[in-house]
UniProtKB/Swiss-Prot annotation:
Residues 163-257 are annotated as: Disordered. InterPro entries: DUF1314 (IPR010741). This is Gene 3 protein. Pfam families: DUF1314 (PF07013). Residues 214-240 have a biased composition (Basic and acidic residues). The lineage of its organism: Viruses, Duplodnaviria, Heunggongvirae, Peploviricota, Herviviricetes. It comes from the Viruses. Residues 163-176 have a biased composition (Polar residues).
Length: 257
């Protein structure tokens, strides 16, 4: 008499449970970089948790065959440098779209893709379809990712900063330049203008006061004294004449010592 044993087969999770699990995982990984099995990586879109964001379609062969998909991020094969746009289908299968090779079936669920599969099946299951946008237009690559937008913002900030530096440099250089102010508006701090002779203060009888007269006399006498000093031979002239009177054979040391 033989014995037979059997194990209960693991049932696939229902679609509602799979949808809930996928939503929780995407909400937790939104905007993050996750390592994939095999050394590759995936970058989850920052707005992936919002409903109705970044959706598109895949057109399969046949009349009016469109599959609704949702964009969730980008996957990078670091060894080969290949890049895939990741999409989730209505039954939460993971697809990767590469420019030139088309659509790849990567995993049956997001859990399998992140934990087991990664990009290992990128060349095994290739689906013949055309990627379309939410307006049913052909998908044009490359699409700007979050890192591309951050790089663009950083470049704009650098340009603004450079222009600000140039503006500050022009302002600093302009401070060393004279301002273009007309001469009529400039007030000099020199000697005040002299009054005409008709407005000068005079003493009695229209004559200048005695103090001004004495100042004039002192000025005239000082000028005469300076003239006499200029006309008289100075000490330097006398020394020069003495040097000239010396014999031509005498050295410079004999003159000064």
């Amino acid at each position: 008499m033989g014995a037979c044993c059997s194990s209960r087969r693991n049932r696939s999770p229902s679609l509602a449970a799979l949808a809930e699990e996928t939503e929780v995982v995407l909400r937790c990984l939104a905007g993050r970089v996750v390592d994939l099995p095999g050394g590759d990586e995936v970058r989850i879109a920052p707005d992936v948790g919002r409903p109705g964001q970044n959706f598109g379609y895949f057109k399969f062969p046949g009349p009016s065959r469109f599959a609704y998909v949702k964009f969730i991020g980008r996957a990078y094969a670091l060894g080969s440098g290949r890049k895939f746009l990741l999409y989730l289908s209505r039954n939460f299968q993971v697809f990767g779209y590469e420019d030139g090779t088309g659509l790849h079936m990567l995993a049956k669920s997001l859990h399998d893709f992140l934990k087991f599969k990664g990009l290992s099946d990128r060349d095994l299951v290739v689906v013949d379809s055309v990627a379309l946008t939410s307006q049913l237009r052909p998908l044009t690559l490359p699409i700007r990712s979050t890192s591309d937008v951050e790089t663009l913002v950083a470049e704009e900030a650098t340009t603004n900063y450079t222009s600000t530096e140039n503006l500050l440099g022009q302002t600093q250089s302009s401070t060393h330049r004279p301002l273009g102010v007309p001469l009529s508006n400039v007030k000099t701090m020199g000697v005040p203008p002299t009054k005409p002779s008709s407005q000068r203060p005079r003493g009695k009888g229209g004559r200048p006061p005695a103090r001004l007269k004495s100042i004039r006399e002192e000025t005239v006498s000082g000028m005469a004294r300076a003239r006499e000093e200029c006309n008289s031979p100075s000490e330097h002239d006398r020394l020069t004449s003495e040097m000239t009177d010396c014999d031509s054979d005498s050295s410079v040391s004999s003159v000064f010592f």
